[in-house]
């Protein structure tokens, strides 16, 4: 990690008539101590708010991170559940893997990837601090009840515009217009490319793991299933309807596996129905994916 350091040739100065007095020596000395100390530490407080979601890995809360002088910042906290692990050591090993991958993802700084801010523990339960995204996950945007609620709230002319340009009812859920769907996929591809360049696989690309912000931009979230190519465990979790055939069969994963999952999301957005709806048997699901 490297950052260019430079000396500002035009420093910010007080406006005319503002300040100008001498800083107290004691305050200036404390400033110097902070700069020269080599280490900083402080206590952070989070007020848990509403649940944003839950799944096999745990629960995500919207929280408020409190600083000093009245500073507050909305962030998301994911509390990782130990339920699926048969021992504390198994839970700890899995959390260490997630922490390592999360640290790598945090350094990528790609606009379409979730920003991971910290990974901590409370009573040996691991917690990931992430940016809070002001928007909806794609599965919610495709839900038919949301489209109906929108229809009830907008004017007839606005509804006509939405149907012509953005979204229409589909067979089982809402269907996005091709231009909108492609824009979402394009931004997800940028996020996946950033992961793949550093040999990380997301491992669970699906509509509920894609957030669409109120600005219209898409972000891939939930890196709890992400692994590095070099250290991928032999047994991994997946969402069967969105998993590539090789993932379902327990064979080696690759960047192509993530791309296949994103392809199923594209089919879902354009068709107006969940991918491979109605298929319950493992073999039927595999055959349907191979023939798509």
Language-model features: locations:
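Conserved short submotifs of the Hanks-type protein kinase catalytic core
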Residues: 123-137, 141, 145
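Catalytic-loop of the protein kinase fold
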Residues: 196-212
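Conserved activation segment of eukaryotic-like protein kinases, specifically the C-terminal portion
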Residues: 233-247
